[in-house]
């Protein structure tokens, strides 16, 4: 919306386990159905849910960002778990943004589930994800580092 209405864009975007395709067309919706402890149990409501969509087109870019234009998009950090039904949403948005010339860091956390980052101090993967977010914010603030350096862990 901001870009389409010529409003200033944020310096960067952090997307944690984003749901970017409400057409539910991603391969991982099926392949990760039994692995995803959060969305797996609600798959049918995802597939047939009209509460959110109403009569709106699920390919509308404001509803499903996957279908948006990523040219001129700010740097993007996407974090997603490998067990998420929404994994394909993240990989496809990352690909689309890169193809549009954007700076994108896609981090797939092995064995993790939807919004695993919210476990904060309970899991090492969550701690690692928050440290990556900190490095991304530093990158946005200084622009001294390359995007690929965001995943490098700090030395203790």
Sequence positions of predicted segments:
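Alpha/beta-hydrolase superfamily serine-hydrolase fold, recognizing
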Residues: 1-156
